[in-house]
Amino acid sequence: MQVKYIKALSIKRIYAERIVSGAKTIELRKRPIGMELGDLVLLYETAPDSIIRGGFIADKTVSLPISKMWTQYNDVMGVEKEFYDSYFDDCEVAYGTLIYQSFCFRSLSLDQIHKLCPGFVPPQATINWRKNWHFQPEWSEVLSRGRGELIQEGRLHEQLNFFAYQ
């Protein structure tokens, strides 16, 4: 599997649930966090949950002035205006990654992640998945399917190179 296409993103449970349910189809941040079209983004739910149980295939990333981001995307943000304004206080630009597809996965607790992924530290924002870390077969399936659909749509041009995993 090409782990360069897998990221882990720290997120509060409520927003992870909204992403997986489809109520939130853009992930907002104060700065760019390196998600690219076709990446599989694993949602690491922060404490007290400390678990990965969902994710999404990243669509395009947009950056807009705070007011324009709200005007264009508020109906798919999954946040209220008061929270949005507070979160982006003192910022001029908002960054958002649109969500192409979202998924539920078999849960991995932080204890399980530590056992399966040597050196894993919960991300402050995002981290790239490492080659020596565990990955679940379903992650490979959704990554391959999502990227395949983006290729068919003519939006992505790089094919994945998978190798057999024992």
Each language-model region and where it sits:
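Contiguous surface segments at macromolecular interaction interfaces
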Residues: 2-6, 11-33, 37, 48-53, ...
